[in-house]
Amino acid sequence: MASRRVLSSLLRSSSGRSAAKLGNRNPRLPSPSPARHAAPCSYLLGRVAEYATSSPASSAAPSSAPAKDEGKKTYDYGGKGAIGRVCQVIGAIVDVRFEDQEGLPPIMTSLEVQDHPTRLVLEVSHHLGQNVVRTIAMDGTEGLVRGRKVLNTGAPITVPVGRATLGRIMNVLGEPIDERGEIKTEHYLPIHRDAPALVDLATGQEILATGIKVVDLLAPYQRGGKIGLFGGAGVGKTVLIMELINNVAKAHGGFSVFAGVGERTREGNDLYREMIESGVIKLGEKQSESKCALVYGQMNEPPGARARVGLTGLTVAEYFRDAEGQDVLLFIDNIFRFTQANSEVSALLGRIPSAVGYQPTLASDLGALQERITTTKKGSITSVQAIYVPADDLTDPAPATTFAHLDATTVLSRQISELGIYPAVDPLDSTSRMLSPHILGEEHYNTARGVQKVLQNYKNLQDIIAILGMDELSEDDKLTVARARKIQRFLSQPFHVAEIFTGAPGKYVDLKENINSFQGLLDGKYDDLSEQSFYMVGGIDEVVAKAEKIAKESAA
């Protein structure tokens, strides 16, 4: 101990002079390394001084200062530790360096760029080490430069929820984009949340009537279930979703949330205008009577926004389910774009791609969204998801992964749309877990299976008809073909949302009337009516009236 005190007193003056010299330098520049820049004797003296001024471990006295709380850290968001600086920008990926470990944000935390012309929010994705985090930008990074200050907000992206969102259009951050003022609400929720616990889930099974004949009869939707609309480009997915929103809002009076994920801006605008015209959305003083909230992240948005806008829409729907106990409809157009956006983000983050170029986390990304869409004891979320099928290939990993989460599938067929039959729903490929006599009842189940049997027999006979012609068929087969063609045309239906294109008023068909109409067809009650009278009508009464009209026109 005496030797340490002597060395300490001898070298204190030398250390003080060195510190004074260093103090005059720029404090932001790092000190030169002794091993590279100092003379050997100075380096040795420095090590001796370090040894002399240090306390031996055996004689260390207990500190009188109070112990620091080692529990959960709380950030001083206005302080020095919460401010980082941009150190790298690669498209939608931004790296941010923080000064110390205390201000380092956790994964999924949102950061805000300071002194930027527009609001730019970043979401933390990776911790790279050396106090650097890699983030995903929720908007364009044009004009962003290195050195720009970034604030750690200390929370995930948080969006407004509640009835104030009805009739409004929001972006991924919950900001209004309909130019109708701010969304005034006291309720906000983070977009990253856990799925409901198993003990909170409900197990009841009930049909959600849509008023669309082919759906209600052959592939009925479960209230609180997940339904997938499969189809290629231009076969009518978005039109079918618009009709479902219209019918469910008018027939059930429930709230809907529409999440536009990576689709055309024009279609988003058309949907908004159509909702205003149909009364689903009301403006001005009657806005509180609106039945739908819209969340858009369209094709022109960066991949970060398209990858998170589905979660924003789901968060709005969850509030109506959990806080207000409502049965909510969540429409996602298009769930494939959600997968596609996550694939883009994955590539930008440098992950090795998986099958067909998709991200290796495809299943977990989709599961994080789908598992939150469920029915609890408080309320339900019934989700209808349009699913674009690349090159009409149902074995593509994106639609194939989605199949595992669905309770019903509505497959739109290009062959049926080419026949001019709309909605172009394939009655044989579309499926539903609800198609069971224990859930639907014997009458509905037998009618649905009877219709499918006739259509399947007609499909099996088409090759024979193409080669030999109708004359070579037996009388029973001729009757099967005639009924199948009538059923095929009777499955078509004019939509309310397509009135301005077709000129025909839309039809909502009650489930009971729907079942009785098709049972009458199977029983042969309408074998004498022409095929043309079954095309683009509602119930069977309209078929009879149309047949009489055609007969009068032919007689004249």
UniProtKB/Swiss-Prot annotation:
Q: Which UniProt keywords apply?
A: ATP synthesis, ATP-binding, CF(1), Hydrogen ion transport, Ion transport, Membrane, Mitochondrion, Mitochondrion inner membrane, Nucleotide-binding, Phosphoprotein, Transit peptide, Translocase, Transport
| Record SMART domains | AAA
InterPro entries tied to this protein:
AAA+_ATPase (IPR003593), ATP-synt_VA_C (IPR055190), ATP_synt_F1_beta_sf (IPR042079), ATP_synth_F1_beta_su (IPR020971), ATP_synth_F1_bsu (IPR005722), ATPase_a/bsu_AS (IPR020003), ATPase_alpha/beta_chains (IPR050053), ATPase_F1/V1/A1_a/bsu_N (IPR004100)
Nucleotide-binding as UniProt keyword: yes
GO cellular component annotations of the record: mitochondrial inner membrane; proton-transporting ATP synthase complex
Q: Give the residues annotated as coiled coil.
A: none
GO biological process: one example? proton motive force-driven mitochondrial ATP synthesis
Region Disordered: start-end pairs = 1-37
One family name in Pfam for this protein? ATP-synt_VA_C
Specify which residues bind ATP according to the UniProt entry for this protein.
231-238
What Enzyme Commission number does this protein have? 7.1.2.2
Say which domain of life the source belongs to.
Eukaryota
Any idea which residues the transit peptide spans? Answer: 1-51
Q: Which reaction does it catalyse?
A: ATP + H2O + 4 H(+)(in) = ADP + phosphate + 5 H(+)(out)
**UniProt subcellular location:** Mitochondrion; Mitochondrion inner membrane
Q: Composition bias, kind Low complexity: at what positions?
A: 1-20
DNA-binding: present as a keyword of the record? no
Q: Which NCBIfam families match?
A: atpD (TIGR01039)
Q: What does this protein do?
A: Mitochondrial membrane ATP synthase (F(1)F(0) ATP synthase or Complex V) produces ATP from ADP in the presence of a proton gradient across the membrane which is generated by electron transport complexes of the respiratory chain. F-type ATPases consist of two structural domains, F(1) - containing the extramembraneous catalytic core, and F(0) - containing the membrane proton channel, linked together by a central stalk and a peripheral stalk. During catalysis, ATP synthesis in the catalytic domain of F(1) is coupled via a rotary mechanism of the central stalk subunits to proton translocation.
Family according to the record = Belongs to the ATPase alpha/beta chains family.
Which PANTHER family does the UniProt record give?
Answer: ATP SYNTHASE, ATP SYNTHASE SUBUNIT BETA-1, MITOCHONDRIAL-RELATED
Q: What is this protein called?
A: ATP synthase subunit beta-1, mitochondrial
